[in-house]
């Protein structure tokens, strides 16, 4: 936010990153950053989960989807020759509410018949090298292109994550590119060419989904989200570092009937900090987290009072974890969700049974 208002256009985040790297070089860092980075380097994801664990979790999600909708979705893993490699933060596999967002991806891809694959090697979109050193950014990011080449995919699709996308948008091509073995991304469903991803060959999921909606490729019933009164938090990296303002809002407005923006000076490029990004989400920092996130919480409290908001949407895995704690402290009664969880609630799937609950098992309005 400082960078938006700085009269000299100085990117404060870059300065902070260099400061962190210098501290790391003299041996000063925190375990909440170092352990996920080490796990990712060793096993491919922050949590250190082995391939069998990832497979089990995705199959559990497929079971839950079938229970809710009556539709059995595929779980493609390490599929050679798939059109698209899908990369998402590992929190979406293992941590609520991210698991509901991941279920949303799986339902969407099944419904449109997307030829895609998950990977158990490149099983992490996030990159805690961003909070450690540029060398570690490069090492952890390299596995994405390596796996895309091994599997022989055409291009890469990325899930809802914040710092993951600063790395992809700002560093990926110069650190590990050019990815000449991949094709310029073209949606196999709509034919849309994602020219902005010409260099990285990697498309953000909200761009992909917004394009599907704009071209009439999805059947949505926003009434299935009538029990949700939503506001939206612009996550710092997708918003300020990438300019992804309209795509998530376009999805939201097509997937629910009750959407309320927070005050204009607290959203889009002027969005407030979640209070616990950049590897600061550990419990030892709890007081600082609650203080740092208070401006965002007060903006949410305002729309709760005015419009009865009960859900905070975002497109960042760290936000989904940290904002949950922030809301519990400052604005009890407001829960956090990903945009593709909202979409999945509204998605009408071919052959589905009559749905009586949303993905969380909460009853939906008739």
Model-derived features with residue positions:
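Redox- and metal-dependent alpha/beta enzyme cores, enriched for Fe-S-associated oxidoreductases
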Residues: 106-112, 119, 214-218, 227-288
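Iron-sulfur-cluster electron-transfer modules
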Residues: 1-176, 180-187, 360-366
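A polyampholytic, Gly/Pro-enriched intrinsically disordered region
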Residues: 137-140, 217-233, 279-292, 353-366
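A short, acidic, amphipathic alpha-helical segment used as a generic capping/interface helix at domain edges
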Residues: 288-310
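Local cysteine-cluster metal-coordination motifs and their immediate loop/turn environment
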Residues: 1-10, 88-93, 122-131, 135, ...
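Short, surface-exposed connector motifs at secondary-structure boundaries
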Residues: 2-3, 149-154, 229-231, 303-310
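Short, aromatic/basic amphipathic alpha-helical patches
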Residues: 171-178, 252, 323-330
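Short, flexible loop segments at boundaries between secondary-structure elements
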Residues: 181-222, 264-269, 328-365
């Amino acid at each position: 936010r400082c960078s938006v208002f700085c009269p000299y256009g100085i990117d404060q985040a870059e300065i902070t990153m260099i400061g962190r790297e210098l501290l790391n070089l003299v041996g000063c860092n925190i375990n909440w950053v170092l352990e996920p980075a080490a796990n990712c380097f060793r096993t491919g994801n922050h949590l250190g989960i082995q391939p069998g664990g990832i497979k089990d979790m995705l199959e559990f999600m497929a079971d839950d989807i079938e229970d809710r909708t009556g539709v059995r979705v595929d779980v493609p893993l390490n599929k050679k020759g798939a059109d698209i490699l899908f990369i998402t933060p590992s929190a979406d596999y293992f941590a609520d509410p991210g698991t509901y967002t991941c279920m949303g991806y799986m339902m969407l891809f099944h419904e449109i018949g997307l030829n895609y694959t998950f990977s158990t090697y490149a099983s992490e979109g996030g990159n805690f090298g961003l909070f450690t050193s540029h060398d570690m950014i490069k090492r952890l990011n390299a596995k994405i292109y390596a796996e895309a080449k091994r599997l022989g995919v055409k291009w890469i699709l990325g899930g809802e994550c914040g710092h993951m996308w600063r790395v992809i948008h700002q560093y990926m091509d110069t650190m590990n590119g050019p990815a000449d073995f991949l094709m310029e991304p073209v949606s196999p469903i709509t034919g849309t060419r994602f020219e902005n991803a010409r260099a990285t060959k990697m498309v953000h999921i909200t761009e992909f989904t917004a394009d599907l909606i704009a071209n009439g490729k999805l059947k949505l019933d926003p009434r299935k989200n009538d029990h949700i009164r939503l506001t939206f938090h612009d996550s710092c990296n997708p918003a300020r570092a990438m300019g992804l303002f309209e795509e998530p809002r376009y999805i939201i407005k097509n997937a629910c009937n009750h959407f309320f923006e927070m005050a204009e000076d607290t959203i889009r490029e002027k969005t407030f900090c979640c209070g616990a990004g950049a590897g600061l989400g550990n419990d030892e920092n709890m007081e600082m987290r609650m203080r740092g996130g208070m401006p965002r919480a007060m903006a949410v409290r305002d729309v709760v009072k005015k419009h009865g908001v009960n859900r905070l949407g975002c497109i960042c895995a760290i936000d989904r974890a940290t904002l949950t704690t922030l809301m519990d402290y400052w604005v009890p009664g407001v829960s956090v969700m990903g945009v593709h969880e909202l979409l999945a609630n509204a998605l009408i799937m071919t052959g589905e049974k009559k749905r009586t609950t949303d993905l969380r098992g909460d009853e939906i309005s008739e």
